[in-house]
Amino acid sequence: LPVAFSDEVGDKPLPVRLLDEPLAVCRLGNRVAAFRDLCIHRGTPISLGWIKNNEVVCAYHGWSYNADGRCTRIPSIPPEHPIPKKACLTQYQTKERYGIVWVCMSEKEPRAPIPDFSPLEDPNFHVLFRDKRHWNCSAARAIENFFDFGHFACVHDGILGDRNQPIPPEVTLTREDNELHFSATRSASQSHAVHAVEHKNNYRVTRPFSIHQWKVEPDGKTEAFCYTVMPI
């Protein structure tokens, strides 16, 4: 699941919340790591600390943790004393792709790969990132909104739909592994745009909460949208 844009993770820990779990996302050297936002020592949020020598340092007692979550330094004990093996942060699987930091909170292999947002890496596309938006609804309802064609005529009259033509287009679904594929054709009469033309929107929905939508314009150019939801 997504937790942050890559450029949000800088020279200090980034506090985020995923599935009701507070996390601290840190850039440590050439790696991005995600930890439970809790120092193993006295329960201080590790996101209150700082990053030094590619390690995250707790703000309370100065314990240092490396990118694997293992404590490497406790300032209050002599250096010759061993650090307990259990002195580790809870760490989660983390990957960086498409300018987004993705986290899997299970210790097992992720059930599904990161969604295919290949246009974000295609030099033929001009890529724009939109600001994150907070929706007061479930993650499933948020992603469903993008292909819930029944609401277009009512909510988006004159833009994406027409209240005089409320019947949504028929679609045929195909399923491939953890993805749903379908297309929907929007007629020119369902838009009030000056140069409205009939066009087909293609959709690939990737479980659990991602969708890739694209359409080919009359001039041959492809417009693509990539959406993903971070359930907090």
Put a short name on every predicted segment.
Residues 3-122, 127, 224:
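Rieske [2Fe-2S] iron-sulfur-binding domain
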Residues 109-232:
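C-terminal catalytic domain of Rieske-type non-heme iron oxygenases
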